[in-house]
Amino acid sequence: MNHKSKKRIKEAKRSARPELKDSSDWTKHEYCKSFDLSHRSVKDNVERADVQRLSPEEFIQRFEKPYKPVVLLNVEDSWPAREKWTLERLKRKYRNQKFKCGEDNDGYSVKMKMKYYVEYLESTHDDSPLYIFDSSFGEHAKRRKLLEDYQVPLFFRDDLFQFAGEKRRPPYRWFVMGPARSGTGIHIDPLGTSAWNALVQGHKRWCLFPTHTPRELIKVTRDEGGNQQDEAITWFNVIYPRTQQSTWPDEFRPLEILQRPGETVFVPGGWWHVVLNLDTTIAVTQNFASTTNFPIVWHKTVRGRPKLSRKWYRILKQERPDIAAIADKVDLQESTGIASDSSSDSSSSSSSSSSDSDSEADSGSEGDAMTHRRKKRRTGGMMGNGDITSQDDCASKERSSSR
């Protein structure tokens, strides 16, 4: 690795994780030597369903309506990404394009050119390496070509947030790429949205917990995790062993997934989940509001993002009056029964145990780790309309930042 590559990588690491003061902090636990990344460590107890034998109506009835996680097979059979999304080809085609791999203390995106990131990925011994998690690739002239390499699966094309407008809607799609030991800490996706995560290369380890699981049971404390508190590998080192003990409550035992190349995980809204990369992985993930989960998403959006909800409703009234009619019937005083990873939705089932004071973070099914880390370092300001100024994953900052 040449001097320039080392310099760019060092700059990105310093900006994204300022709490790690020197290089030894990144390898303090020596997880690259000690942590078990083998497939045998995963129980893999979530149902799989072949999309070639599953109609959209069956998917809704069997999985989406009952909020049941599932691993879908053969979603990616026709995707060009299966051939195009390799380290070698991505490094060659996008070598000088910058991808987001973190956020600094002020919520600005930390970005790295693909050529430097691949060098980092192939050589790192970091306990929890930097992880490309880029939500703006679809808005960039060159990076948007990634959109041509995959199709939104048939079951997830009911994208109701499109009616909020592209500029105002929360970030919803991410290109995701990282080495072994990278990942995202335990979280619930924002605003009651559900998500799908399609893995093209590598293997991911998932743990999922039902929405009513007490957060204090599954969150790593500062005393336990130190400055690696929010990292996925810390969670698997600290919390996971407890879930396997006889004293762990049966109703809160995790679902586990060993996600393989070509498999797509469906994460229903409200489910806690944590994801660890077992080797180099490349994936795409999207969050969505559908006709099925709309009542809960609407409830949480009105409570957590009032300005967004007003604009969304105006357009729904014009374009989808059937959905606006559903919104009219939602009782905003009733609990949704679906937890939030923040206290903004005061009527949610998790509000009594929540310790966060910010509104719901706009991150994807794998993406809350960076957002939570930033929350602890700064407090977003409130605008007069009740929305948090750090809304939309600091989308306007991210798009204008060249860091």
From Swiss-Prot:
- Might you give the EC number(s) for this enzyme? 1.14.11.-
Q: Which SUPFAM superfamilies match?
A: Clavaminate synthase-like (SSF51197)
- Listed binding positions for 2-oxoglutarate are N197, T285
Residue numbers covered by motif Nuclear localization signal 5: 373-378
Q: Where is the composition biased (Basic and acidic residues)?
A: 12-23, 394-403
Question: Major place of localization?
Answer: nucleus
Q: Where is this motif: Nuclear localization signal 3?
A: 141-145
Give the range the annotation lists for the signal sequence: none
UniProt motif (Nuclear localization signal 1) ranges: 6-10
* Motif Nuclear localization signal 2 positions after renumbering to this chain: 91-95
Instruction: List the keywords (alphabetical).
Output: Chromatin regulator, Cytoplasm, Developmental protein, Differentiation, Dioxygenase, Iron, Metal-binding, mRNA processing, mRNA splicing, Nucleus, Oxidoreductase, RNA-binding, Transcription, Transcription regulation
Q: Which PANTHER family match?
A: ARGININE DEMETHYLASE AND LYSYL-HYDROXYLASE JMJD, BIFUNCTIONAL ARGININE DEMETHYLASE AND LYSYL-HYDROXYLASE JMJD6
Q: What is this protein called?
A: Bifunctional arginine demethylase and lysyl-hydroxylase JMJD6
Q: Tell me the gene name.
A: jmjd6
